[in-house]
């Protein structure tokens, strides 16, 4: 038994030639198992490669579909021709109209929202406006402390429009035929130009003179100061007397000017500053009333002559009888009358 086992063991160790092929197969099988164990696990990367490949295929399909759609649209546009161009143009016009309507709606909404900003400046009772109109004609005496100025624009704005209407009424009653648009524009430009321009100029001087007044207060003060101008022009446009105009110019216009001057004096420190500021305001305010009474008609008549030409009646030659007594020449009147008539007939024939 022992002797039999030894050759078997020796044969397993490679001593016997008959076991050579079997041992090679076993060794080959062992190397195969070891190689499989030592191989990298590439199964995950293989799935990732498949996913990327699938994604590329889908992208290529999408690009192909987009190219086909573009080609189809191009073919349709070429096939439709002018019809396709009109359709595209109509879409663009509709888009532009929509955008324009949207912008207008937003502007209207913003304008309505901005009305609330101006509402405090026009929120005033009629009784307050009436009392302020009367106070604008009464000069104040106490100028030691700053006088109160109404911070609203309803009364001044209505007075400016009233002055425009009075100017139009004056031109209606002056037997002057003009074009309504030209007259309206001239009157509005004159009144609003004076109100806004002089208020800005006086406010600038007040800033230089260190006066305690704001632009809103200056507009209100000068606007209520036009109440005297409205009274004077309304009366003198209906009663054409220069003496009456000068009387109202000094009394009514002077009272309204003194009221404004007193308010500015109470808000200005220093005699030189008071003289400069108040003297400028008084001169501009009184001269503006003179301008409205005298120069305004000439301006409108000049516009009328420019638009329609001067209205000059034609010259007519009419023979007249010479008076019976001529101190310079002692000639018979019958001879002179006959001679004059003959000359007139000769001129008319030519």
Curated annotation (Swiss-Prot):
Residues 170-187, 238-240, 296-350 are lumenal. Residues 1-10 have a biased composition (Low complexity). It is found in: Cell membrane; Cytoplasm; Golgi apparatus, cis-Golgi network membrane. Glycans are attached at residues 333-334, 337, 339, 346. One of its GO terms (biological process) is cell differentiation. The chain crosses the membrane at residues 149-169, 188-208, 215-237, 241-263, 275-295. Residues 1-51 are annotated as: Disordered. The keyword Metal-binding does not apply. The modification N-acetylalanine is found at residue 2. Expressed by nucleated hematopoietic cells (at protein level). Keywords: Acetylation, Cell membrane, Cytoplasm, Differentiation, Glycoprotein, Golgi apparatus, Membrane, Transmembrane, Transmembrane helix. It is a multi-pass membrane protein. It comes from the Eukaryota. GO terms for cellular component: Golgi apparatus; intracellular membrane-bounded organelle; plasma membrane; transport vesicle. Its main location: membrane. InterPro entries: tRNA_Mod/Golgi_Maint. PANTHER family: NATURAL KILLER CELL-SPECIFIC ANTIGEN KLIP1 (PTHR15627), PROTEIN YIPF3 (PTHR15627:SF14). Interacts with YIPF4 and YIPF5. This is Protein YIPF3.
């Amino acid at each position: 038994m022992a002797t039999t086992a030894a050759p078997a063991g020796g044969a397993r160790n490679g001593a016997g030639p008959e076991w050579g092929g079997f041992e090679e197969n076993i060794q080959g099988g062992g190397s195969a198992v070891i190689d499989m164990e030592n191989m990298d696990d590439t199964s995950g990367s293989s799935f990732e490669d498949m996913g990327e490949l699938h994604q590329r295929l889908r992208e290529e399909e999408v690009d192909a579909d987009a190219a086909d759609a573009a080609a189809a649209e191009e073919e349709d546009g070429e096939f439709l021709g002018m019809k396709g161009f009109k359709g595209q143009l109509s879409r663009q016009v509709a888009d532009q109209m929509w955008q324009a309507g949207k912008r207008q709606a937003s502007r209207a909404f913003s304008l309505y929202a901005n009305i609330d900003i101006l509402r405090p400046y026009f929120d005033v009772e009629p009784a307050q406006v009436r009392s302020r109109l009367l106070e604008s004609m009464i000069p104040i005496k106490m100028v030691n402390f700053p006088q109160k100025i109404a911070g609203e624009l309803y009364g001044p704005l209505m007075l400016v429009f009233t002055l425009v209407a009075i100017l139009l009424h004056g031109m209606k009653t002056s037997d002057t035929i003009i074009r309504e648009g030209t007259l309206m524009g001239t009157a509005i430009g004159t009144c609003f130009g004076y109100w806004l321009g002089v208020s800005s100029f006086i406010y600038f001087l007040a800033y230089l003179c260190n006066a305690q007044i704001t632009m809103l207060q200056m507009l209100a003060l000068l606007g209520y100061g036009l109440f005297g101008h409205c009274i004077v022009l309304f009366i003198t446009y209906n009663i054409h007397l220069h003496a009456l105009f000068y009387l109202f110019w000094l009394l009514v216009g002077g009272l309204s000017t003194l009221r404004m001057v007193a308010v500015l004096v109470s808000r200005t420190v220093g005699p030189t500053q008071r003289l400069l500021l108040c003297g400028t305001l008084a001169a501009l305010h009184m001269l503006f009333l003179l301008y409205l009474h005298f120069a305004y008609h000439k301006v409108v008549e000049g516009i009328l002559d420019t638009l329609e030409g001067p209205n000059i009646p034609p010259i007519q030659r009419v023979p007249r009888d010479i008076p019976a007594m001529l101190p310079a020449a002692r000639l018979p009147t019958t001879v002179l009358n006959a001679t004059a008539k003959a000359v007139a007939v000769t001129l008319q024939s030519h």
